[in-house]
Amino acid sequence: MARSTLSKPLKNKVNPRGPLIPLILLMLRGVSTASPGSSPHQVYNITWEVTNGDRETVWATSGNHPLWTWWPDLTPDLCMLAHHGPSYWGLEYQSPFSSPPGPPCCSGGSSPGCSRDCEEPLTSLTPRCNTAWNRLKLDQTTHKSNEGFYVCPGPHRPRESKSCGGPDSFYCAYWGCETTGRAYWKPSSSWDFITVNNNLTSDQAVQVCKDNKWCNPLVIRFTDAGRRVTSWTTGHYWGLRLYVSGQDPGLTFGIRLRYQNLGPRVPIGPNPVLADQQPLSKPKPVKSPSVTKPPSGTPLSPTQLPPAGTENRLLNLVDGAYQALNLTSPDKTQECWLCLVAGPPYYEGVAVLGTYSNHTSAPANCSVASQHKLTLSEVTGQGLCIGAVPKTHQALCNTTQTSSRGSYYLVAPTGTMWACSTGLTPCISTTILNLTTDYCVLVELWPRVTYHSPSYVYGLFERSNRHKREPVSLTLALLLGGLTMGGIAAGIGTGTTALMATQQFQQLQAAVQDDLREVEKSISNLEKSLTSLSEVVLQNRRGLDLLFLKEGGLCAALKEECCFYADHTGLVRDSMAKLRERLNQRQKLFESTQGWFEGLFNRSPWFTTLISTIMGPLIVLLMILLFGPCILNRLVQFVKDRISVVQALVLTQQYHQLKPIEYEP
């Protein structure tokens, strides 16, 4: 049926051969995020999937990125979305990821092996996907200026758009429901999650169609609204309809996100609180180096050593600390005591300057899963900072850099890590830094090993009544801090520049990394043990209540008060929230009872500083104005009196007293 191309037809897009059945979709839209203890910079294997109307995956793309930072262009073919779709597409029996059906079409007439002439025009037939000729005509239809396609959102649309229908009408029951597509009126929306358009021009798709391939690729791009949504793991769905004469054919498709950990940790065996509790291994005798070379052509396969026990790991930390200290300061290791601190914090960080490496793809060490966030409670020095560093931590920054735009991975140099507000990590994602208020400082990790002189240790064993002063404990971070990066430039000429290549320093770094991994495992084991213990206790409680059911339960039989298990983590969290609420209420009550003059000082901190600054000069000026005239008058009167006295003295000096004349009788 002919129609004008200058206006949209006001037609009902519901299938006239079947009534519109109301469909109520109950969807649980949860926010899918990583585990609460994971770092936001952790890299996952992310897969974006495009599904057909039966929720089958027909196209997918994968990559290694942090969650909610990778928004690629999705390029499925239009005919891929029609697999197991309505019969007029011709692919109702076609399985996903199968080859395009039908023989190719030929130019200049039919020939053996060809279905029909590619140049044969499309008459009254609806574009289909079952042959190369049909796919070519479908491409021509979607690229025409007066035809094309439009897309309508599914259940995630606003409530006022409920009249747009369900999957039976491809969510496009009436005009105005479309939010994107390729049509002459250019449908658009400010709230929908995606935009859809053709990925190839018509000229490019012609040859692809003639070669009997999928030749109607789409390009689906995420909008700003879609990038803010974190419920992609449950999937979102749309309907697509062709804008042609008569009834517009259509289909439904969806987009969902799947992610998995690149390095899952699967526990095998028992679940002790402290993992790998093994006795201390006996020291092996030192072997002299052999000059015998292995035969050429036979590579030596490295043997994987079993994981070290707790005692071995602690001893390796002290041994590595001694080797590093002996290499840099041999005079301090002539006679000394190195003590490993048994209480937290077990590690301290030293901020350093260094040159990190920039990667466009996630390196292997960025994909290591971390079930818990490890934080540093003590960081000293000044080093390299990245991100929006708050004023409370700017003292740790010698140089502050802003994160570059784009998706990059900043890997810390060897022997260092990034201490971020979200925890320790070997590499950081610039996308996460740009999306959040996270900041990171480049630090060296040093175990809490204290250095004591022999006099201090001997004094502990001496029985003396004298009270000695508290000794100053030097930690390994104070003695060797900044040696990985900053100490290299400072150690030129002293031999410390070669420390990075020595086996001693590598031994210390390896011991630190092993111990950090075991600390994380211990935290996980403690968490699992507490959960298991609570389950056992609650199960035993239920069993005892059933046994003493006739007596009224366990508490009635024991004649004691009933005790219940409480998750103190949640209680503490709720208590802190209530405490903050009460403090806010008291603060508001206190402010409401204050006068305007008192409140002026509280609301304007700068006003208090201004008053305290100018109050002194103002008081002095006021005193001068009040008592200045009186003091000035007194001073003038005093000067006048002194001048009068001086004038009198001058006048008296010009005259002398005459002697009296005596007359003789």
UniProtKB/Swiss-Prot annotation:
Ranges for region Immunosuppression: 538-554
Region spans: Receptor-binding domain (RBD): 34-267
Coiled-coil blocks: 500-537
Transmembrane segments: 611-631
Location of the motif CX6CC: 555-563
InterPro entries (alphabetical): FMuLV_rcpt-bd, TLV/ENV_coat_polyprotein
Function field: The surface protein (SU) attaches the virus to the host cell by binding to its receptor. Interaction with HECT ubiquitin ligases activates a thiol in a CXXC motif of the C-terminal domain, where the other Cys residue participates in the formation of the intersubunit disulfide. The activated thiol will attack the disulfide and cause its isomerization into a disulfide isomer within the motif. This leads to SU displacement and TM refolding, and is thought to activate its fusogenic potential by unmasking its fusion peptide. Fusion occurs at the host cell plasma membrane. The transmembrane protein (TM) acts as a class I viral fusion protein. Under the current model, the protein has at least 3 conformational states: pre-fusion native state, pre-hairpin intermediate state, and post-fusion hairpin state. During viral and target cell membrane fusion, the coiled coil regions (heptad repeats) assume a trimer-of-hairpins structure, positioning the fusion peptide in close proximity to the C-terminal region of the ectodomain. The formation of this structure appears to drive apposition and subsequent fusion of viral and target cell membranes.
Protein name: Envelope glycoprotein
Lineage of the organism: Viruses, Riboviria, Pararnavirae, Artverviricota, Revtraviricetes
